[in-house]
Amino acid sequence: MTQNSQETVIGRITSVFGVKGWLKVFSYTDPKDGILNYRDWTLLLDGKRIPIRLEEGRRQGQGIVVRLKGIDDREVARTYCGAEIRVPTEQLPELPEGEFYWHQLEGLDVFTVEGECLGKVHHLLETGSNDVLVVHATAGSIDQRERLIPYLPDQVVQQVDLKGSRMVVDWDPEF
């Protein structure tokens, strides 16, 4: 999930499904069908914001399919393909202490326990065993390398300071 201002991206429309205007959705929520808990969406497509309501949805194989209010034709549905699905950030459930949404980690400065700047969290990857921080170099980092750092709280990630916009990791900069 990524955040823009007071909205968080929770998925994207990938393609049409069937002939009655249903759409396939790639969900960024965990679990995947958690996206169906949000009824009022804002779609962002080609720079345009489109408020729309989720009428119904369900799991279909490994993915999610949805029907949006006012869309009951395959060709009309096709015009929404590629849209980001956004919801107000305030609607996201509060997480337990020490847990974070990905959008909260994106943009944090990353430092080693020795105080060396490795860069800034650009985005995260889901690998199956654990999430991975993709850290891009910044003007203040020790070099210009991109780093992939496992997001393992208490093992690799020692501290997350959202207010200070920084993260401390136990990570060898040479790795």
Swiss-Prot record:
Gene Ontology terms describing biological process: ribosomal small subunit biogenesis; rRNA processing
Any GO MF annotation of the entry: ribosome binding
The keyword Phosphoprotein appears for this protein: no
Quaternary structure (record): Binds ribosomal protein uS19.
Keyword check for Membrane: no
Keywords: Chaperone, Cytoplasm, Ribosome biogenesis, rRNA processing
Entry note about domains: The PRC barrel domain binds ribosomal protein uS19.
SUPFAM superfamilies, per the entry: PRC-barrel domain (SSF50346), Translation proteins (SSF50447)
Gene Ontology CC terms, in alphabetical order: cytoplasm; ribosome
Subcellular location: Cytoplasm
Similarity section: Belongs to the RimM family.
Function: An accessory protein needed during the final step in the assembly of 30S ribosomal subunit, possibly for assembly of the head region. Essential for efficient processing of 16S rRNA. May be needed both before and after RbfA during the maturation of 16S rRNA. It has affinity for free ribosomal 30S subunits but not for 70S ribosomes.
Any Pfam family the entry gives: PRC
Listed PANTHER family: RIBOSOME MATURATION FACTOR RIMM
Protein origin, superkingdom: Bacteria
Domain PRC barrel as annotated: residue spans: 97-175
InterPro entries: PRC-brl_dom, PRC_barrel-like_sf, RimM, RimM_N, RimM_N_sf, Transl_B-barrel_sf
Protein name listed in UniProt: Ribosome maturation factor RimM
